[in-house]
Amino acid sequence: MRSEPRGEQEVSEGGVSGAPLSSLFTRHSSLAIHGYASLWGVADLNGDVVARGAFAASLAKTGAGSVRMLHQHEGRAVIGVWDRMIEDERGLFVAGRIMDWSAEGRFAQALSRAGALDGLSIGFRSSRARREGRLRVLVEVELWEVSLVTFPMLPGARFGVV
């Protein structure tokens, strides 16, 4: 008599314990959002000003899909994906989807639908900057993430549900 290790299930062509493999994968629902993660020439509450074109090199190198969508800048809380990031005449326009694949994602979806979460904030490394009085002008940045936040450092950086 063969004994199975505890907690493990037999896998066959029919799936796990006879269930079809397709039942192991579920479709996730998403909530489409868009807005401005950064605005050209506007000082944030920390005295940073992003110059027009500051994200161009980073986005050309990585694309929007490599920039993470986080909740409140928490690296462990990836809550969705960014589908588009475009530098336009106003700033960095972003469009993406908050996914329901985690508790944080579902929470962010609910808050966004209710209008309680609508801020955006960028996580980056400055590649080139200059000082203008008390302000730091970011000329080129390496964009790592755009977070959905309660209180953005740039008060005008907001998103809405599509």
Language-model regions: role of each:
Residues 42, 74-76, 99-102:
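Short, charged/polar surface micro-motifs in flexible loops or helix N-caps
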Residues 46-47, 78-80, 131-134:
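Short, solvent-exposed polar/charged micro-motifs at secondary-structure junctions
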Residues 59-94:
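A glycine-rich, hydrophobic loop/mini-helix early in the fold
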